[in-house]
Amino acid sequence: MKTFGDKLKFHACGEGFTWETQDRNKDINLVKSSWRKAVSYIKDPNYKLIILDEIIVAVKLGYIDEDEIINGINLRPELTHVVLTGRGASEKLIDSADLVTEMKLIHHPFRAVSYTHLTLPTILRV
C-alpha cells in the first residue's frame, strides 16, 4: 500500500470475523456506519474505484439490506467502479451488476498461517 501513497484510502470497518461475533447488534451498527462512509466515497467523483470487501457476506447475514446496497451503488458517477466481494451473492445483486466473476480457490494465506497473524499487507505482499 506504500506504493500508492495518498492515492489510496483504506478503512477497516469491522472488528474481526463475523462468525466469531460476540455482539450482533454492534456488528450491524458497524456495518451501517461503514456503509454510510462507503456511500460518501461512491458519490464522490474523485474516487474512481471503491472496493467493498466481504459486503456480500454482510448482506447474507442480514446486517444490511441488499436494496440499500443496490441503491447506493446506483448513486455512483459514470466513471466510478464499485467492487463487491464475498460469497453467495443473490440473483438480485447479480442481475444488478455490470460484471460478475466467480473465483476458484487455488491458494489462500488463511490455510498457511493463523488468522491473528494476517494483515492486508501480508495478504497483498506489499
Region annotations inferred by a language model:
Residues M1-S40:
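Conserved P-loop
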Residues V59-E66:
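Conserved ATPase-coupling elements of RecA-like P-loop NTPase cores
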